[in-house]
Amino acid sequence: MKSAYLNDEFFSRLETLALNLRADLSGYFGGKHFVRSYGQTVEFADYREYQLGDDIRRIDWNLYSRFEKYFIRLFTDERQMDVQIFLDCSASMGKENRGKAAYAVSVAAALGFLSVHNMDKVSFKLIKEGAVEDPFGTIIGKNTFFRAISILENIDFSEDADISEAVTSCVNTGSNNGLSVIISDFLTRKDWKKAIDYLTYKKRQVLVLQLLSPDEVDPAYSGRVNLIDVESGDIGDPRNMKLKITRSLQLAYQEALRDLKADIKSFCTSRGADFISVTTDKPIERMLFGELLKAGIME
């Protein structure tokens, strides 16, 4: 499942962007995210009067010559953001639609690249059934990132996924130190809201990305059809349906899809999370440089 997006030209265009975290970070130093505290970087922030125990190397002697008082220079604190990308690997995300699978992997890779390019750390957490697989661990640096991507392009999309069970059972979600992204189509009867509640409880900034194929947004079926649940693949599954596609049924489907999107958006807004729904025929660059910039996720 090689993606046409994942090439040097694509990644070079991403180098002009950065992920934006709206909250202060706790955690590791060494990234490019400024927080409202003083630290060890070289970017000047302010002055204050010298106090016993301060580093005398920070005394500004020019100010001393003017005011005959000791002032020390304060510098901004930069910290490293922890970016966690939860990727729904259920069958509906790509078993029968390799283009949708490649798009999902490309979006995950783009967000991961932005993380390591800005000296942050990233992990790809694959949601399979009710568990999370973390095949690469924490990734820091582009060499490790590109090795992970070469493997990520070949992951298997199959069976079902329980987003809430997987995320809430994940042992390394961190706390108050970064961004959690959930990439899924959310075409499931299983609960997904507990996952968002759990991550916001952990004081994570949350981005929910819904990916839908054009056929899922506007199905081209007509006449009599036999719909088989892709996540079970079982022709005897009670969720399968025999339908006669009529105009009224098409309109009912589109209304149900609008209701689903509205429900996700409303819930995310109530929890302080961001929600973006994207059709997979939309160029990824337009989504990154358009939707995510507009939402303030990137800068």
What does each of the following model-derived ranges do?
Residues 1-135, 139, 179-182, 189, ...:
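An amphipathic, basic-hydrophobic helix/alpha-beta surface used to engage anionic
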Residues 1-36, 46, 172-178, 188-190, ...:
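Von Willebrand factor type A / integrin I
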Residues 53, 130, 158, 212-214, ...:
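Short, solvent-exposed coil/turn elements at secondary-structure transition points
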Residues 93, 152-156, 272-275:
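Short amphipathic alpha-helical interaction patches enriched in hydrophobic/aromatic residues
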Residues 102, 157-164, 255-258:
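Conserved phosphate-coordination/catalytic loops
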Residues 137-150, 293:
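Short, electropositive alpha-helical surface patch
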